[in-house]
Protein backbone atom coordinates (compact mmCIF):
# COMPACT_ATOMS: atom_id res chain seq x y z
CA UNK A 1 0.00 0.00 0.00
CA UNK A 2 1.43 3.32 -1.03
CA UNK A 3 1.18 6.60 0.80
CA UNK A 4 -1.44 7.88 -1.67
CA UNK A 5 -3.71 4.90 -1.01
CA UNK A 6 -3.41 5.42 2.74
CA UNK A 7 -4.19 9.12 2.35
CA UNK A 8 -7.24 8.36 0.22
CA UNK A 9 -8.44 5.82 2.76
CA UNK A 10 -7.98 8.35 5.54
CA UNK A 11 -9.92 10.96 3.56
CA UNK A 12 -12.73 8.44 2.99
CA UNK A 13 -12.90 7.70 6.72
CA UNK A 14 -13.00 11.43 7.48
CA UNK A 15 -15.76 11.95 4.91
CA UNK A 16 -17.85 9.10 6.36
CA UNK A 17 -17.40 10.41 9.91
CA UNK A 18 -18.41 13.91 8.79
CA UNK A 19 -21.54 12.53 7.10
CA UNK A 20 -22.36 10.53 10.21
CA UNK A 21 -21.97 13.63 12.37
CA UNK A 22 -24.14 15.72 10.01
CA UNK A 23 -26.90 13.08 10.07
CA UNK A 24 -26.80 12.99 13.86
CA UNK A 25 -27.08 16.79 13.98
CA UNK A 26 -30.03 16.74 11.55
CA UNK A 27 -31.79 14.06 13.60
CA UNK A 28 -31.25 16.07 16.80
CA UNK A 29 -32.53 19.22 15.11
CA UNK A 30 -35.64 17.40 13.88
CA UNK A 31 -36.26 16.05 17.38
CA UNK A 32 -35.93 19.52 18.90
CA UNK A 33 -38.28 21.00 16.29
CA UNK A 34 -40.87 18.30 17.04
CA UNK A 35 -40.56 18.99 20.76
CA UNK A 36 -41.00 22.73 20.13
CA UNK A 37 -44.13 22.09 18.03
CA UNK A 38 -45.60 19.88 20.77
CA UNK A 39 -44.84 22.51 23.42
CA UNK A 40 -46.43 25.26 21.30
CA UNK A 41 -49.54 23.13 20.80
CA UNK A 42 -49.73 22.37 24.54
CA UNK A 43 -49.38 26.07 25.40
CA UNK A 44 -52.12 26.98 22.91
CA UNK A 45 -54.50 24.44 24.47
CA UNK A 46 -53.63 25.71 27.95
CA UNK A 47 -54.37 29.28 26.82
CA UNK A 48 -57.85 28.12 25.86
CA UNK A 49 -58.61 26.07 28.98
CA UNK A 50 -57.04 28.23 31.73
CA UNK A 51 -57.90 31.72 32.88
CA UNK A 52 -55.02 34.24 32.86
CA UNK A 53 -54.73 33.98 36.65
CA UNK A 54 -54.49 30.18 36.52
CA UNK A 55 -51.88 30.39 33.74
CA UNK A 56 -49.87 32.85 35.85
CA UNK A 57 -49.98 30.49 38.84
CA UNK A 58 -48.86 27.60 36.64
CA UNK A 59 -46.01 29.70 35.19
CA UNK A 60 -44.79 30.65 38.66
CA UNK A 61 -44.94 27.04 39.80
CA UNK A 62 -43.06 25.95 36.68
CA UNK A 63 -40.05 27.99 37.82
CA UNK A 64 -39.83 25.90 40.98
CA UNK A 65 -41.08 22.48 39.87
CA UNK A 66 -40.90 22.14 36.07
CA UNK A 67 -41.40 18.34 36.03
CA UNK A 68 -44.50 18.58 38.20
CA UNK A 69 -45.99 21.34 36.06
CA UNK A 70 -45.33 19.44 32.83
CA UNK A 71 -47.21 16.42 34.20
CA UNK A 72 -49.95 18.70 35.54
CA UNK A 73 -50.36 20.44 32.17
CA UNK A 74 -50.91 17.09 30.48
CA UNK A 75 -53.40 16.11 33.17
CA UNK A 76 -55.28 19.42 32.85
CA UNK A 77 -55.54 18.99 29.09
CA UNK A 78 -56.87 15.46 29.56
CA UNK A 79 -59.39 16.63 32.16
CA UNK A 80 -60.60 19.39 29.84
CA UNK A 81 -60.84 17.05 26.84
CA UNK A 82 -62.81 14.46 28.83
CA UNK A 83 -65.02 17.25 30.19
CA UNK A 84 -64.22 16.18 33.75
CA UNK A 85 -63.66 19.80 34.71
CA UNK A 86 -65.42 22.99 33.69
CA UNK A 87 -63.51 25.11 31.18
CA UNK A 88 -62.02 27.64 31.55
CA UNK A 89 -60.24 26.42 34.65
CA UNK A 90 -59.96 29.33 37.04
CA UNK A 91 -57.31 29.94 39.68
CA UNK A 92 -59.48 28.57 42.50
CA UNK A 93 -60.10 25.28 40.64
CA UNK A 94 -56.40 25.02 39.83
CA UNK A 95 -55.56 25.49 43.53
CA UNK A 96 -57.97 22.65 44.40
CA UNK A 97 -56.38 20.38 41.80
CA UNK A 98 -52.92 21.26 43.11
CA UNK A 99 -54.02 20.55 46.70
CA UNK A 100 -55.36 17.12 45.70
CA UNK A 101 -52.19 16.38 43.77
CA UNK A 102 -50.06 17.42 46.75
CA UNK A 103 -52.09 15.22 49.12
CA UNK A 104 -51.84 12.22 46.78
CA UNK A 105 -48.09 12.72 46.45
CA UNK A 106 -47.73 13.06 50.21
CA UNK A 107 -49.75 9.88 50.80
CA UNK A 108 -47.41 7.97 48.45
CA UNK A 109 -44.39 9.30 50.36
CA UNK A 110 -45.87 8.18 53.69
CA UNK A 111 -46.62 4.70 52.32
CA UNK A 112 -43.10 4.47 50.97
CA UNK A 113 -41.58 5.41 54.32
CA UNK A 114 -43.77 2.95 56.21
CA UNK A 115 -43.04 0.07 53.85
CA UNK A 116 -39.35 -0.19 54.78
Swiss-Prot record:
Disulfides per UniProt: none
UniProt keywords, alphabetically: DNA-binding
GO CC, any one term: cytosol
InterPro entries, alphabetized: DNA_bind_arc, PDCD5-like, PDCD5-like_sf
Listed name of the protein: DNA-binding protein Tpen_0471
PANTHER family in the cross-refs: PROGRAMMED CELL DEATH PROTEIN 5
One GO MF term: DNA binding
Family: Belongs to the PDCD5 family.
Species name: Thermofilum pendens (strain DSM 2475 / Hrk 5)
Superkingdom to which the source organism belongs: Archaea
Span of the signal peptide: none
